[in-house]
Amino acid sequence: MILPVGIPTAMGIYALIQKDQALLKDAVFIGTSVIEAVGITYGLKHAFNRQRPYDKHPDKIHLVGKAESSPSFPSGHTTAAFALATSLSITYPKWYVIAPSALWACGVGFARMNQGVHYPSDVLTGAAIGVGCAFVNVYVNKWLNKVLFE
């Protein structure tokens, strides 16, 4: 989860140093999209408390990497990746932002399934939450920008 936190944080720090209010607004939008999505995901994880695939089916699914301690549904890594990719794509609607960020977010989801830590439904739900939060946050940030910047 380094990139979903690091990118908006770095943008915000740079914006503050350069006194660039437009970039700071972008950083706030991207950062709050990720925070909202991850917050919703962790609430759902504990509400559903779904066992991880490698725990439920140890004879069929072999864990790659370290064991996870949180419940499986939905995928937090996928949620954060899609929230970041979507909010970056909304903020900077250029093919050279949209294509790599979408490929990266999809890669995160596939990797989580390949590692045996998530079911496809965990990843699809995480992706939907991430994308949804970024789009909803367009409207939330209109209000937030008035509070923070006016």
Model region roles, listed by residue range:
Residues 10-18, 86, 111:
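Residue-level signal for alpha-helical transmembrane segments in multi-pass membrane proteins
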Residues 1-2, 25-28, 94-99:
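Membrane-penetrating hydrophobic segments
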Residues 16-23, 49-54, 117-121, 142-147:
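Transmembrane helix-loop junctions in multipass membrane proteins, especially transporters and channels
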Residues 17-40:
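Interfacial segments of alpha-helical transmembrane regions
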Residues 37-53:
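Transmembrane alpha-helix/helix-exit interface in multi-pass inner-membrane proteins
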